[in-house]
């Protein structure tokens, strides 16, 4: 199981939210590029970036910071936040990211997702963010009527290779992942499932690996020191 450190961008800084609430923002650094280099040095094979301002605005806004990060590290960088049309997705790849994460558009316009998968293949990742199993959209500020399991099945049928599942109620809380909801998305020959939200201990990562989860995105726990990335990678990815 791959461990993926998260960098959430807001106003050019590295921040974390609690349960997606923009009013509960903690700043963890003014130099996201240095943070990305830190995670690469710790052994990360991939870095996860969310443009929080972009998610709220409906279009990417932190483009200069994102481009600086992709130039500063040699590992793949995946980007989410405000990518809701073909033009913004093409522009994201121009910034040097290896993968884009689509959330709202998967609910609103699955036909576009199918078209993008045909064009970009495995570089298209779907982000399913849910409260009580129901998918949220618009930077978590709106709720759809679609269940996460239904959306995951639909995306798999469209050829999506990877899905990131975030339990919003756990995100930034350092409680524990929602094992049941996350595992419910794992299907034979279906998309690889990556867990996000609530991870606070290496034991949480080990449990996710046992459930057949392909990857785990770690945010708050890295910035608070609850998890040491280099040590966790050694334990989880390399078997101790």
Swiss-Prot record:
It is found in: Cytoplasm. GO terms for cellular component: cytoplasm. GO terms for molecular function: 1-(5-phosphoribosyl)-5-[(5-phosphoribosylamino)methylideneamino]imidazole-4-carboxamide isomerase activity. Its EC number is 5.3.1.16. Gene3D superfamilies: Aldolase class I. Pathway: Amino-acid biosynthesis; L-histidine biosynthesis; L-histidine from 5-phospho-alpha-D-ribose 1-diphosphate: step 4/9. It is an enzyme of class 5 (isomerase). Keywords: Amino-acid biosynthesis, Cytoplasm, Histidine biosynthesis, Isomerase. InterPro entries: Aldolase_TIM, His_biosynth, HisA_bact_arch, Isoase_HisA-like, Isoase_HisA-like_bact, RibuloseP-bd_barrel. Transmembrane segments: none annotated. Pfam families: His_biosynth (PF00977). It comes from the Bacteria. GO terms for biological process: L-histidine biosynthetic process; L-tryptophan biosynthetic process. It catalyses: 1-(5-phospho-beta-D-ribosyl)-5-[(5-phospho-beta-D-ribosylamino)methylideneamino]imidazole-4-carboxamide = 5-[(5-phospho-1-deoxy-D-ribulos-1-ylimino)methylamino]-1-(5-phospho-beta-D-ribosyl)imidazole-4-carboxamide. Its main location: cytoplasm. The active site is at 8 (proton acceptor), 129 (proton donor). Belongs to the HisA/HisF family. PANTHER family: 1-(5-PHOSPHORIBOSYL)-5-[(5-PHOSPHORIBOSYLAMINO)METHYLIDENEAMINO] IMIDAZOLE-4-CARBOXAMIDE ISOMERASE (PTHR43090:SF2). HAMAP family: HisA (MF_01014). This is 1-(5-phosphoribosyl)-5-[(5-phosphoribosylamino)methylideneamino] imidazole-4-carboxamide isomerase. It comes from Herpetosiphon aurantiacus (strain ATCC 23779 / DSM 785 / 114-95). The gene is hisA.
């Amino acid at each position: 199981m791959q461990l993926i450190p998260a960098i959430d961008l807001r106003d050019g800084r590295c921040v974390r939210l609690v349960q997606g609430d923009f009013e509960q923002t903690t700043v963890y650094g003014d130099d996201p590029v240095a943070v990305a280099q830190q995670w690469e040095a710790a052994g990360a094979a991939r870095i996860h970036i969310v443009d929080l301002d972009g998610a709220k605005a409906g279009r990417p806004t932190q483009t200069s910071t994102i481009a600086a990060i992709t130039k500063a590290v040699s590992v793949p960088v995946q980007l989410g936040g405000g990518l809701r049309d073909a033009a913004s997705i093409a522009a994201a790849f121009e910034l040097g990211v290896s993968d884009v994460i689509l959330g709202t558009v998967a609910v609103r316009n699955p036909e576009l997702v199918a078209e993008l998968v045909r064009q970009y293949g495995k570089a298209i990742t779907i982000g399913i963010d849910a409260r009580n199993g129901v998918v949220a959209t618009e930077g978590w500020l709106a709720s759809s009527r679609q269940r996460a399991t239904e959306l995951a099945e639909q995306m798999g049928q469209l050829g999506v290779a990877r899905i990131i599942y975030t339990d919003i109620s756990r995100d930034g809380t350092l409680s524990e992942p929602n094992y049941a909801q996350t595992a419910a998305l794992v299907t034979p020959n279906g998309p690889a499932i990556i867990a996000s939200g609530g991870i606070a201990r290496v034991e949480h990562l080990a449990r996710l690996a046992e459930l057949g989860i392909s990857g785990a995105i770690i945010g708050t726990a890295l910035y608070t020191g609850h998890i040491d990335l280099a040590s966790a990678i050694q334990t989880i990815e390399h078997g101790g």
